[in-house]
């Protein structure tokens, strides 16, 4: 399988009142197409920082990252905009990237249909269950057609039973859409 993400010697330090804090030190790993990996550790150990660096949202202090293709990043909270319908929410990434072509709109509408949210497209986020909101957030992330998907505790706000169900749904979606 082809290597699609290479992380080499990533370091991240922050300035604090009493000196530097080393959040990440010499983190290295590769991800091949089709891999599913988990980054596990206690709160505050730098998992979210690492994902933010990989996605380009936060600068690294040193090291190298090589990415083959687009990255989709789904944060802990669904970050759906409450004043926008589900349909407008799932198109947001395409709007931001100025890539709202007819082909991409149709692709996104198909994702809504395929994953059971099309009939809720005119609803607002407050009208959906937690699991449905997470699926909408995932569809918004998938709409930009990422090759790599980063999930930062994307289901931590859900109860245990819903989390299991949504995790299983998402794994099926990633497999069906051929996303790493």
What is each of the regions a protein language model found here?
Residues 40-42:
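The feature captures the beta-strand-to-loop junction immediately N-terminal to the Walker
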Residues 55:
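Helix-to-loop junction immediately C-terminal to a conserved catalytic motif
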Residues 87-95, 105:
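Short helical segment in ABC ATPase nucleotide-binding domains corresponding to the A-loop/adjacent helical element
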Residues 102-120, 171-172:
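Conserved ABC ATPase "signature" region
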Residues 124-128, 132:
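Conserved ABC ATPase signature
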Residues 143-147:
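A short, proline-enriched helix->beta-strand linker immediately N-terminal to the Walker B motif
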Residues 149-152:
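Catalytic Walker B motif of ABC-type/P-loop ATPase nucleotide-binding domains
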């Amino acid at each position: 399988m082809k290597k699609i993400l290479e992380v080499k010697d990533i370091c991240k330090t922050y300035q604090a009142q009493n000196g530097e804090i080393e959040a990440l030190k010499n983190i290295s790993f590769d991800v091949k197409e089709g891999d599913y990996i988990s980054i596990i550790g206690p709160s505050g150990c730098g998992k979210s920082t690492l994902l933010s660096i990989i996605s380009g949202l936060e600068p690294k202090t040193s090291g190298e990252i090589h990415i083959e293709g687009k990255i989709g990043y789904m944060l802990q909270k669904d970050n759906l905009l409450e004043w926008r319908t589900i349909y407008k929410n799932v198109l947001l990434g395409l709007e931001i990237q100025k890539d709202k072509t007819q082909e991409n709109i149709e692709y996104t509408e198909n994702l809504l249909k395929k994953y059971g949210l099309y009939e809720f497209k005119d609803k607002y986020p407050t009208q959906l269950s937690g699991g449905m909101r997470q699926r909408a957030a995932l569809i918004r992330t998938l709409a930009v057609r990422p090759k790599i998907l980063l999930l930062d505790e994307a289901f931590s706000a859900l109860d245990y039973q819903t989390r299991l169900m949504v995790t299983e749904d998402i794994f099926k979606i990633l497999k069906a859409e051929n996303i790493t």
